[in-house]
């Protein structure tokens, strides 16, 4: 598979094209230092042979923000060094920290915006980023990634909503690009041109008056022109449309743009790859071979391979899918695709982040703070002597499935096929009952269930049930009228 072939980024050989993008874990303390829980989270990705591990955003400054990692002074270097060393000792995975600057927000809903920053503030931000990238090199990381996506400072300067009136102002593209350009220049000067530096930014902001892929293509070209070593594309995640809950700090993933940043199960798969492909094609047409990473509901290996093999993107960044199963790359390489624990995009992880709780996956065993260690020798669950005894009842606009418990099962995957024969994983649950409310009356559906261990060994499929939701009364009366006309 092309997906599992190495890629070189500014001299750095990354063993495969699977990346885990930065995801907040909320495992650190308020002090921002690396602790054992943080190390354990990222070592699991290395155990699964993820090609490029991007450590969650760590701040270049000391502003209060809750449990967020820091790289704002030299006191953080020993802990960061230990993290990088532990990952390198585990496998040949490469690791970079994502480096962030954020503006102030308050529980009242007030937030600082880029027009409130003085030129001295901007100069300080430039220096802080450069110093942080230099510390990343000192700590033994393989590179660094600048966070210029979503709701944060670098992204806010890039946005068309930037209302500054000076040389950093949003009225011109060059004004919006000035800060990120200076940051990269300073990082190169302090960390060296041979130290890989990537940038994560939005392909589309998905807010009123925000920029779209048309701007993102030009932003990407400028980043390539000034020597950025890889481009990682996200979308949305803005404060402008965030839903503010009384007494809580605004969370930029609660509005529509936040949904687009972390699309739930109601969104189609491969949600944003077309943006990344368009941006890569534009950059390449202008003479640059800068690697491009995409993200957005990409945990299906066939989708990931298609994007990379076709040259649409160079790297596939899988966030929630690798949180659910850090061993995803290893299992795919070993021909154990059936053992991959498929993310069902329930977004429990997103909810935990938004409520300032430690981020885990709902598919892990109850009470687990980390994904369970892989156990290839574990035995698959077995249905009892009477099988799964899967039953389905239809009524009140939904179909209800029930089945018997399989000893040794950590979860059950519910699969559904429509009349066209398209089969998909609908959900993964820990109980023996499930409701499907997204069904069309008068359509015949087919369901089955499989039981899985915590490390992905699957049972044989349950018995298959076929069920049809009765048509609503308005539909039956219409059908009778049509029959009368026909007769």
Please place each PLM-identified region on the residue numbering:
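Recognizes extended acidic, P/S/T-rich segments that occur
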Residues: 413-442, 454-461
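Short coil/turn motifs at secondary-structure junctions
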Residues: 102-104, 204, 408, 419, ...
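Flavin-dependent oxidoreductase catalytic cores
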Residues: 1-380, 385
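Pro/Thr/Ser/Gly-rich low-complexity, intrinsically disordered linker/stalk tracts
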Residues: 377-408, 441, 454-487
């Amino acid at each position: 598979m092309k997906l599992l072939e190495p890629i070189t980024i500014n001299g750095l050989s990354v063993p495969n094209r699977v990346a885990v993008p930065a995801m907040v874990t909320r495992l650190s303390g308020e002090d921002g230092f690396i602790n054992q829980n943080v190390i354990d989270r990222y070592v699991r990705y290395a155990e699964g042979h993820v090609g490029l591990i991007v450590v969650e955003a760590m701040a270049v400054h000391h502003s209060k923000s809750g449990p967020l990692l820091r790289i704002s002074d030299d006191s953080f270097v020993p802990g960061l060094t230990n993290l990088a060393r532990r990952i390198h000792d585990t496998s040949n995975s490469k690791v970079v920290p994502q480096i962030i600057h954020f503006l102030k927000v308050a529980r009242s809903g007030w937030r600082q915006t880029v027009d409130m920053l003085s030129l001295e503030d901007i100069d300080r931000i430039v220096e802080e980023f450069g110093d942080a990238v230099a510390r990343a090199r000192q700590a033994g990381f393989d590179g660094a990634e600048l966070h210029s996506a979503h709701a944060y400072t670098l992204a806010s300067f890039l946005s068309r909503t930037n209302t500054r009136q000076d040389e950093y102002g949003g009225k011109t593209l060059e004004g919006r690009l000035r800060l990120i350009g200076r940051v990269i220049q300073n990082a190169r000067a302090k960390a060296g041109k041979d130290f890989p530096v990537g940038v994560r930014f939005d392909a589309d902001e998905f807010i009123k008056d925000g920029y779209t892929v048309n701007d993102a293509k030009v932003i990407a070209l400028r980043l390539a022109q000034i020597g950025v070593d890889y481009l990682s594309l996200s979308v949305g995640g803005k404060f402008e449309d965030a839903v503010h809950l009384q007494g809580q700090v605004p969370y930029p993933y609660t509005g529509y743009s936040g949904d687009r940043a972390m699309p739930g199960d109601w969104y189609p798969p491969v949600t944003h790859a077309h943006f990344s492909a368009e941006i890569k094609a534009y950059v390449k047409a202008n003479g640059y071979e800068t690697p491009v990473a995409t993200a957005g509901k990409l945990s299906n290996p066939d989708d990931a391979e298609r994007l990379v093999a076709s040259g649409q993107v160079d790297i596939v960044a899988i966030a929630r899918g690798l949180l659910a199963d850090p061993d995803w790359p290893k299992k795919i390489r070993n021909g154990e695709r059936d053992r991959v624990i498929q993310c069902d995009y329930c977004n429990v992880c997103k909810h935990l982040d938004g409520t300032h709780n430690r981020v885990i996956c709902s598919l892990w065993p109850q009470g687990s703070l980390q994904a369970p260690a892989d156990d290839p020798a574990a035995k698959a669950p077995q249905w009892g002597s009477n099988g799964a005894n899967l039953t389905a009842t239809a009524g009140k606009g939904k179909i209800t499935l029930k089945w018997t418990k399989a000893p040794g099962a950590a979860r059950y995957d519910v699969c559904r096929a429509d009349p066209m024969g398209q089969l998909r994983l609908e959900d993964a649950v820990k109980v023996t009952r499930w409701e499907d409310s997204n069904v069309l009356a008068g359509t015949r559906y087919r369901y089955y269930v499989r039981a899985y261990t915590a490390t992905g060994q699957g049972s044989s499929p349950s018995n298959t049930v076929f069920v049809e939701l009765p048509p609503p009364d308005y539909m039956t009366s219409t059908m009778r009228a049509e029959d009368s006309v026909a007769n």
